[in-house]
Amino acid sequence: MAIKVLVVDDSSFFRRRVSEIINSESRLEVIDVAVNGREAVEKAKALKPDVITMDIEMPVMDGITAVREIMAASPTPILMFSSLTHDGAKATLDALDAGALDFLPKKFEDIARNRDEAVSLLQQRVIQIASKRAFMRRPVARPAAATSSARPLASRTAAPAASAPARPATTKFRASGKKYQLTAIGTSTGGPVALQKILTRLPMNYPHPIVLIQHMPATFTAAFASRLNTLCKIQVKEAQDGDVLQAGVAYLAPGGKQMMIDGRAGAARLRIIDGGDRMNYKPCVDVTFGSAAKVYGDKVLSMVLTGMGADGREGARMLKSAGSTIWAQDEESCVVYGMPQAVAKAGISSEDLPLDRIAERMLVEVGLA
């Protein structure tokens, strides 16, 4: 049976374009369209689609409000379309907070080298998030924004970013006894929510630097880092060339670039480079993980989270060869079980963990719990 899709956009041209692309894949079927958020909410209840594609800026009711109402009344996997502007980035992150699973730029030429690649990407994203239809999450409950430009106080409540329903803490974690000097986390589809859930649970005194590699457009990473910084007790920043890695600071790889680590453990710096056109991902998890293995050897605590494809597998292999620790997010809590599956199937990860317990496991491992 085909995956049923509801297409929501106030542009008749875009509704038609998206519908044609979706209907050209035999596994997909557009069952209806909506021209604004209010209509989308009503049709989501009545038609019960498997996936909804949603514009952000629409009359009557905007896409973010529509996502919140749909997730409250009839939770459905939602793929957002957004502009590649700073405001578009902020709105997209709001939509992910509200419960949307993934996003794509509205200008397809910005996400692919040719039309065929763009068509395939849209179709695959819809198919991937449709698999979460029977296991939908609730929207993120965000804490109130800080009233000043300073980072929130350590006593501030962390945002319980959504994922799998919380599991009972039946397993008591034990530290391995290894010593670490760096934490490295790589992710793609579903990563913004996953990273928010993990990072908001880390204390200000987290004992070493954190490098974050999230597949994301260049215009989105600054907005994402800024948002995380307002929500987290640790400092979060978009990485810049020459940054000296400091304990308790998370460095988000800038979109459209590669992030590498240079120097020696304890005095390492970041190099931000273009990386050429040979790499499929910018930023690429393999690139950062590989450089971390060379600089830190067996002193890296690394994680591969939800995401499509296999980026991170080869970098994780290098980390394991150097003696470092690699964990993977488990299938049930992933939006897309691609990157973690690649690591787990290759026998590289030592533990497969549910998202809602990764932060707890990290704190035990580094001696803070």
Curated annotation (Swiss-Prot):
Q: Which domain of life is it from?
A: Bacteria
Q: Which residues form the CheB-type methylesterase domain?
A: 176-369
Which sites are catalytic?
188, 215, 311
Q: Which GO terms describe its molecular function?
A: phosphorelay response regulator activity; protein-glutamate methylesterase activity; protein-glutamine glutaminase activity
Q: Which InterPro entries match?
A: CheB-like, CheB_C, CheY-like_superfamily, Sig_transdc_resp-reg_Me-estase, Sig_transdc_resp-reg_receiver
Which SUPFAM superfamilies did the record assign? CheY-like, Methylesterase CheB, C-terminal domain
Region Disordered, residue ranges: 146-175
According to its record, what is known about the domains? Contains a C-terminal catalytic domain, and an N-terminal region which modulates catalytic activity.
Q: Which PROSITE patterns match?
A: CHEB, RESPONSE_REGULATORY
How is the polypeptide modified once translated? Phosphorylated by CheA. Phosphorylation of the N-terminal regulatory domain activates the methylesterase activity.
Identify this protein by name: Protein-glutamate methylesterase/protein-glutamine glutaminase
Output the GO biological process annotations, alphabetical, semicolon-separated: chemotaxis
Q: Which reaction does it catalyse?
A: [protein]-L-glutamate 5-O-methyl ester + H2O = L-glutamyl-[protein] + methanol + H(+); L-glutaminyl-[protein] + H2O = L-glutamyl-[protein] + NH4(+)
Q: Quote the subcellular location field of this record.
A: Cytoplasm
Q: Its family? A: Belongs to the CheB family.
Q: Which Gene3D superfamilies does the record match to this protein?
A: 3.40.50.2300, Methylesterase CheB, C-terminal domain
Q: Name one Pfam family in it.
A: CheB_methylest
SMART domains referenced in this protein's UniProt entry, alphabetically: REC
Compositionally skewed regions (Low complexity) per UniProt: 146-171
The Enzyme Commission number assigned here is 3.1.1.61, 3.5.1.44
Q: Which CDD domains match?
A: CheB_Rec, REC_CheB-like
